[in-house]
Regions:
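Alpha/propeptide regions of enzymes that mature by internal proteolysis
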Residues: 2-70, 142
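A residue-level signal for conserved active-site and pocket-lining positions in enzyme catalytic cores
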Residues: 10, 139, 256
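Short acidic, Gly/Ser-rich segments with clustered Asp/Glu that frequently serve as metal-coordination loops
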Residues: 11-15, 73-76, 258-260
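Active-site histidine-anchored catalytic micro-motif
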Residues: 28-34, 48, 60-69, 75-135
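Generic structural signal for buried aliphatic residues
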Residues: 66, 211-213, 242, 270-275
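Anionic-ligand-binding alpha/beta catalytic cores of soluble enzymes and soluble regulatory domains
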Residues: 123-207
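A conserved acidic, glycine/proline-rich C-terminal tail/linker
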Residues: 191-265
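Pepsin/retropepsin-fold aspartyl endopeptidases
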Residues: 263, 268-282
């Protein structure tokens, strides 16, 4: 196991919450390295927490421990869990769907229900609203520092018993592909879909082709345009839209140096559908 501990939350950095998690981790061991995935997730957005783990975990060394705290049910009877993925990474999080994308795309080998009474920061028994510090950062640091074995965090539970959000698969037919807009490339407003590049290749769509892009919200068409399938943003003029391959080798839709989401009022989630087909030659 490595000595990396990577933190994710919806806490932001405007108060001391994240710093307190760092402090607890380094009190457990000053031999670990604590890093941030993000703390800018919108409050209570479990879907985004799940996706950001999927986006990031596999690029860290095996044995890295992740702590994800987007926890609207903190203090309730929801479970606290730790998982070992098939890629060899550990994730500690509330059992509220935060592992949905990891379970679906990467696979989870083992899950432990953390004993919140025994496995928590000493003298924190009266605190019921900051498990991110008292349970997750504390146990994540112990795991990263090799001060506790994964199996000793609590009781093993069935992988299929954990909470999971609905994840839809992209589909294709002989001349088109359809998928969901999973998430935004948040700072730039680009759309990230669940459509793999392989689907476009199977239709013999290559860079330089024009595509008919149609977007639906709750089955109502809200956008349609003919857009170039570009290798990079530089392949189109500033202000022009493009279809491109994102860093997960899925299909994205963007505007060069502008926000596609803001310009066209496009959101994300399973009720946002995108349809791509090759535009007819003129």
């Amino acid at each position: 196991m490595g000595n990396y501990l990577v933190l994710q939350s919806d806490f932001g950095l405007s108060d001391g919450a994240v710093s307190a998690m760092y402090g607890v981790a380094y009190t457990v061991s000053d031999d670990i390295r604590v890093e941030n995935l993000t703390h800018d997730i919108l409050p209570y957005d479990i879907w985004v927490a799940s996706y950001r783990l999927y986006q990031t975990v596999k690029y860290w060394p095996k044995g890295t421990v992740f702590v994800s705290v987007v926890d609207p049910g903190v203090g309730s009877d929801r479970r606290s869990i730790a998982c070992l993925t098939y890629s060899g990474h550990y994730i500690i999080t509330p059992d509220n769907g935060s592992l949905s994308h990891i379970k679906h795309y990467e696979g989870i080998k083992k899950v432990i229900e953390i004993d919140e009474v025994k496995s928590r920061l000493p003298h924190s028994e009266e605190s019921h609203t900051f498990h991110g510090r008292d349970v997750y950062a504390y146990n994540g640091a112990r795991l990263a520092a090799n001060k506790i074995a994964f199996e000793r965090l609590g009781q093993a539970i069935n992988v299929d018993s954990i909470e999971a959000l609905e994840i839809r698969e992209a589909t294709k037919n002989e001349d088109s592909v359809t998928g969901s807009i999973d998430i935004l490339d948040i700072r730039f407003g680009s759309l990230w879909t669940n459509i793999p590049l392989a689907f476009l290749k199977s239709l013999e769509i290559v860079h330089g082709n024009n595509l008919v892009v149609t977007i639906y919200h709750q089955d109502k068409k809200v956008y349609q345009n003919i857009i170039k399938f570009a290798r990079s943003f530089a392949d189109v003029n500033v202000g022009e839209p493009l279809v491109y391959v994102n860093s997960l080798v899925n299909i994205g839709v963007a505007v060069n140096q502008d926000s596609f989401s803001d310009l066209y009022h496009i959101g994300t989630g399973n009720d946002w559908t995108i349809h791509l087909s090759k535009a007819p030659s003129i």
